[in-house]
Amino acid sequence: MEEITVEDLPVDSKVKDIIKSRGIKKLNPPQTEAVKKGLIEDKRLLITTPTASGKTLMAELGMISHLLNKGGKAIYVTPLRALTSEKYSTFKDWEKLGFKVGVTSGDYDTDDPWLRNFDIIVTTYEKLDSLWRHSAEWLKDIDYFVLDEFHYMNDGDRGPVVEGVAVRAKRQGTILALSATIGNAKDVAKWLNADIVATNWRPVPLKEGVMYSEGKKGHIILYSDGTTNKLKGDDPIIAYTLDILSKGGQVIVFRSSRKYAETTAMKISQYMNFVKLDDKKLLETAERIKEVEDAGSNEKEVLYNLIVRGVAFHHAGLSKGLRDIIEASFRERIIKVITATPTLAAGVNLPARAVVIGDIYRFNRKIVGFTEMISTMEYRQMSGRAGRPGYDNHGEAIILVRSKVEVDKVIDKYLHSDIEPIESKLGAEGPFFSFVLSLIASEGEITEDRLKDYVEDTMLSKQLVRKYYNNAIDWLSKNEFIKSNDDRLQLTKFGRRVSDLYLNPFTAVTIKNYLERAESPCDIAYFHLIAYTPDGPLVSVGRNEEDALLDNLDCELIIDEPDDELEFSNYISALKVAFILKDWIEEVDEDTILSKYGIGSGDLRAIIDTMEWLTYGAFHVSSILDLNQHTSVLEKLHKRIADGVKEELLELVRVPGIGRARARLLFNQGIKRPEDIVMKPERVKSLLGQNLGEKIVKEAARIIA
């Protein structure tokens, strides 16, 4: 295909200047094909190409061309909050043309009216879904939708929301769907009424292989091109990593669990004295790790000792502050090796010369004790990180297998097979009922014919639509989420609040049913109930922890212990979450919580954020149902979770700049309310320091004014 230079693009010269300022002189093959298929002329496209093939620039060309030629608003939707920040930063370039760029995520109980003044909006699928539920007026102005990481429609948890957003988007404006390579692109494109741009082109060629051990003979890598490589050493991952490092490359090692990622990093670090490193920059990076505030002391110490050796681990248990430093240092080629869980493959763009997939088996989340092979899609996501443009003339993706017997099976599944097809994930009661509720919420009121028309526009088979539709209407009516009025379906007051709060209807019903029968639960019982809902956070519980959690329980729970093994697993997980939260609101030191429960700072933050939202939801559910004996308690618990304090500190933490530690310091010195801060400014300054003290006094005065 004839290439297109940036200068040849049929766009405004200012658009060309911005693209050229990034060092881009010509379009790559996928970008060229997209332009030739109508990207700049507002055509609907499904672009399915490997990682790092320039999909972001395609999105920018599509959005900016639309805004310049037709006006309106463009929205860029991604499944991950980390990606919203990354894309927002990139899109800020277009403010040079006079376009305002905004970003929003989280806080599902608002319609964000301030966004009406923005031209390009970056958000998550969940946030856009919640905005539609709130019937935000400014959403009607959006007529260009970029649906990023569209293959997430195949994800069991996120898929229903991605599909729901696509159903609405394709009725409202132009869609540009960006996806990794998928197995049924033609079917998906037909459903979206879009043309396809599908290619396996990569900016850096990929060399794939499978590695197995032959005992004392060493480790053999069989590459897909027929070549082989033989390595010496006790451990195959270490042997391969050192081989790549000796050639000036970087390595990402994917492991199936956090524990494996951490122990692998520690093993590799012991051999890094053979590798050329920039000790000064590594020490500077390690010192920055020490300064991160949203992380535990132990994990900072462990990472410090690894980073000075050029190695780090990366997983969701780490705080955002730690992950950001590790990612930046790896991009700057200071850290040479990252060992990670597969979540890194789905997140921010972080390429390396070589990628090792250390485990092709993982535990099934639904069936206790059952393992399964990772999908071909997951392998492609991980291998897609191999090869760094501008640094590597090729990338390598190596799969580690347990024995030579597995080699042929692995090559066939991951190197020679098509990726799994995208299928609807609305085919279960929970996601389907929630989808129907969201449609009614976004419409205000809707006829059954129009609602059926929406539902039949999903990728779900007509047979399954018929199976679930009547059940959904019956269940939502029976549980008082919706009501019928002259052949029109509307939300009840309860249904509207649940939808606005972005609660799963099954979560709302669970909370409603148990609160109605509970009299005066303890804090642990409230937390356990809320964590036991479908929206609740899950944490792993060791066998030795189960008895201890139950033995330490000193009050009665609202929910009886289940007999079913899987349900008991969820039940005991919810109990662990409840104990973690109880310690948090009793002002137990964060390091103590992390150590006591064996979690990371990222886990603690995720638990706090999720439970703060759900407790806020439970408060509103109890309020709208006039369950007054619970309402005031839940309101206080929500506020205490937000700040991690005892009830006596709630007044102080209202003041911006005062968190749990400063509030306790002030309280213990007799400063217990904002009024006390204003009355004793010199005492506050002596406790908090002159500059901070002055700011706190001003904020307190503003609050009580």
Swiss-Prot record:
EC identifiers of the protein: 5.6.2.4
Transmembrane segments: none
Motif (DEAH box): 148-151
Molecular functions (GO terms): 3'-5' DNA helicase activity; ATP binding; ATP hydrolysis activity; DNA binding
Tree of life domain: Archaea
Residues the record lists as binding ATP: Q31, T49, P50, T51, A52, S53, G54, K55, T56
PROSITE patterns assigned to the protein according to its UniProt record, in alphabetical order: HELICASE_ATP_BIND_1, HELICASE_CTER
Keywords recorded for this protein, A-Z: ATP-binding, DNA damage, DNA repair, DNA-binding, Helicase, Hydrolase, Isomerase, Nucleotide-binding
Domain Helicase C-terminal residue range list: 236-430
Catalytic class of the enzyme: isomerase
InterPro entries referenced in this protein's UniProt entry, alphabetically: DEAD/DEAH_box_helicase_dom (IPR011545), Hel308-like_dom4 (IPR048772), Hel308_helicase (IPR053416), Hel308_SKI2-like (IPR050474), Helicase_ATP-bd (IPR014001), Helicase_C-like (IPR001650), Helicase_Hel308 (IPR022965), HTH_61 (IPR046931)
Residue ranges constituting the Helicase ATP-binding domain according to the UniProt record: 36-200
Effects seen without this gene: No visible phenotype, non-essential it can be deleted. Greatly increased sensitivity to mitomycin C.
Catalysed conversion reaction: Couples ATP hydrolysis with the unwinding of duplex DNA by translocating in the 3'-5' direction; ATP + H2O = ADP + phosphate + H(+)
Example GO BP: DNA repair
HAMAP family in the cross-refs: Helicase_Hel308
Assembly with partners or alone: Monomer.
Function per UniProt: DNA-dependent ATPase and 3'-5' DNA helicase that may be involved in repair of stalled replication forks.
Protein family (similarity comment): Belongs to the helicase family. Hel308 subfamily.
Name this protein carries in UniProt: ATP-dependent DNA helicase Hel308
Protein's organism: Sulfolobus acidocaldarius (strain ATCC 33909 / DSM 639 / JCM 8929 / NBRC 15157 / NCIMB 11770)
